[in-house]
Design a protein with these regions (language model features):
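Glyoxalase I/VOC metalloenzyme domain signal
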Residues: 1-3, 9-30, 39-83, 96, ...
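Short loop/turn motifs at secondary-structure junctions and domain boundaries
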Residues: 90-95
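A cross-kingdom feature marking solvent-exposed beta-strand/loop segments within repeated
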Residues: 84-89
Length: 225
């Protein structure tokens, strides 16, 4: 599963645009008064005008540049800490990754993730060009088991790091939906996850697919678009 284009919402597009384009230095590839898009490596990230709960997404970075990425990001945005005050996590666990978290002006929880089992090796210094691609999107659902069963049966998206009623990634190391139940706290600050409107373009092999809450029967009662 390769995540090609994710669209979310932000209440203040000017602040959101300034953060991604000026603070983080990501190239703007589409810009209107109602929406804008930045290039994130091979992926695109768009924001439309709107008030929604906070979403979670992750961006892959090279495994060789984690320390440089931390210093670069700390100069531009506060890193999110767990209750013990830690701001850099891993590499450990099933993902064997190093992780840095921050929030954008809309409150979305963004993550830089370096996957140590993937050969993303780049020389520094770290810069916005080392944001390689979108690799995760948090899908908040009423029932994780039922949602994952549906995603596997209907879309062929498989759980790949175990299955749990509170946290199940589907897809693969190159791109995943992180399926969690409503109210589960997003790491590392414990912000309760809520369903959000989104539009995701992704690729399975050579097939391009589109996904919105309207395509997911387990989200339709949420009234998302």
């Amino acid at each position: 599963m390769r995540l090609d284009h994710l669209t979310l919402h932000a209440p203040d597009l000017s602040a959101q645009r300034a953060f991604y384009a000026l603070t983080l230095g990501l190239p703007v590839c589409h810009d209107t008064p109602e929406a804008f898009t930045v290039q994130v490596g091979r992926s695109r990230l768009s924001f439309r005008q709107g008030h929604t709960p906070a979403a979670h997404f992750a961006v892959d970075i090279p495994r060789t540049l984690v320390t440089q990425a931390q210093a670069w990001l700390e100069a531009r945005a506060p890193l999110l800490a767990d209750p013990a005050g830690q701001v850099r996590f891993g590499p450990d666990g099933a993902f064997h990754s190093s992780n840095l978290y921050f929030r954008d002006p809309a409150g979305h929880i963004a993550e830089f993730i370096a996957r140590h089992d993937l050969p993303f090796d780049h020389a520094g210094p770290f810069g916005s060009q080392h944001a390689l691609h979108l690799s995760e999107f948090g899908l908040v659902v009423p029932d994780v088991t039922g949602a994952v069963d549906w995603l596997e049966a209907r879309l062929g998206l498989r759980a790949w790091v175990g299955r749990s009623p509170t946290f199940t990634p589907v897809g693969g190391a190159d791109g995943s939906l992180i399926v969690v139940p409503r109210g589960r706290g997003w790491f590392p600050i414990g912000l309760p996850g809520q369903p959000v409107p989104f539009h995701l373009t992704y690729r399975q092999g050579q097939v391009e697919r589109h996904l919105t809450p309207a395509d997911l029967p387990f989200l339709r009662p949420q009234g998302l678009t």
